[in-house]
Amino acid sequence: MLHNIRIVLVETSHTGNMGSTARAMKTMGLTNLYLVNPLVKPDSQAIALSAGASDVIGKATIVDTLDEALAGCSLVVGTSARSRTLPWPMLEPRECGVRSAREAEHAPVALVFGRERVGLTNDELQKCHYHVAIPANPEYSSLNLAMAVQILAYEVRVAYLDRQQANAPVEEEEEAPYPLVDDLERFYQHLEQVLSHSGFIRQAHPGQIMSKLRRLFTRARPEAQELNILRGMLTSIEKQDKYPQRGTGDTAGKSKD
C-alpha cells in the first residue's frame, strides 16, 4: 500500500527541503517522491540532509506540471490553510491518513505540498479532492516543508499499521472504484465545452461557475460508472443540439449496449 502514496512537491526552491522531505518520507516507509517544476535540481545538499534517504532522492520523478504528477491517482489531497475565498472539503491530518491508506490499497494517492513561501495556487488546489490543514499553534504556525510532510506521512503510516493489525481483507472493504484524476479533468473539459456552446457560460470567461461546479462534483465524488453516465449525458446533449463534436480519439462517456 505505501508504494502507492505519492509525496508531491510543487516548485520547491531549496534543495535542503528536498533532502529533509526524503528523510521524513523514508522514516515512515514512503519512497515515491514527485518534484513538480523544481526551481533547483537535487544536489549534494539534498543528499546530505536526506541523512541516509538518498535513494528516495535518486528515484524522485521530476515533471513539468502538476497534472503529470497526479496522472493515474484516484485521490488527491492538497495542503492548505483554511480559506474563505476557496471553500473546499477539508480533512484533519488523522482523517487524511485514514482515507489515504484505504484508497492506496487500490490506486495511487497523491499528497500535494506547495511552495515554501506561498503554498499552492487556487488553480492547483482545485485539482485536489480534499484540502488538509495541520492544526498548528495559531500564534506561531510556521511549519517548514519537511515538517508538514513528516506529519502527514506519520498519519498515513499509523493508518496503514492499524489496517495491518486489524488484518482487514481488501476484498471485504473494497469500495466502488473512483475515477482517476485524468478522467475527472476530461469530464470538466467536456462539461465546460457543452456549457459554453449552450450559452450557459461564456467560453472566454467561465468565471466562478466552473470553480463552483468542480466543488460540487468534488463533494459528491461520483464513482467511475456514475462519471461515465454524466459523460454520456453530455455526449447526448451534443448530438441532440448538433454541437461540434470532439476529437474521434475521445470515446469516454459514450453509452454501451
From Swiss-Prot:
Keyword field: Cytoplasm, Methyltransferase, S-adenosyl-L-methionine, Transferase, tRNA processing
Record-level GO cellular component terms: cytosol
SUPFAM superfamilies: alpha/beta knot (SSF75217)
Region of interest (Disordered), ranges: 238-257
EC number: 2.1.1.200
Binding positions for S-adenosyl-L-methionine per the UniProt entry: T79, S80, A81, G114, I134, S141, S142, L143
Residues annotated as transmembrane: none
Catalytic activity: cytidine(32) in tRNA + S-adenosyl-L-methionine = 2'-O-methylcytidine(32) in tRNA + S-adenosyl-L-homocysteine + H(+); uridine(32) in tRNA + S-adenosyl-L-methionine = 2'-O-methyluridine(32) in tRNA + S-adenosyl-L-homocysteine + H(+)
One GO MF term attached to the UniProt entry: RNA binding
Entry-linked Pfam families: SpoU_methylase (PF00588)
GO biological process: tRNA nucleoside ribose methylation
Enzyme class: transferase
InterPro entries: Alpha/beta_knot_MTases, RNA_MeTrfase_TrmJ/LasT, SpoU_MeTrfase, tRNA_m1G_MTases_N
UniProt keyword annotation of Endoplasmic reticulum present: no
Broad class of the protein's primary localization: cytoplasm
Alphabetical list of PANTHER family matching this protein: TRNA (CYTIDINE_URIDINE-2'-O-)-METHYLTRANSFERASE TRMJ, TRNA/RRNA METHYLTRANSFERASE
Family stated for the protein in its record: Belongs to the class IV-like SAM-binding methyltransferase superfamily. RNA methyltransferase TrmH family.
Oligomeric and partner information: Homodimer.
Name of this chain's protein: tRNA (cytidine/uridine-2'-O-)-methyltransferase TrmJ
Organism: Yersinia pestis
Phylogenetic placement of the source organism: Bacteria, Pseudomonadati, Pseudomonadota, Gammaproteobacteria, Enterobacterales
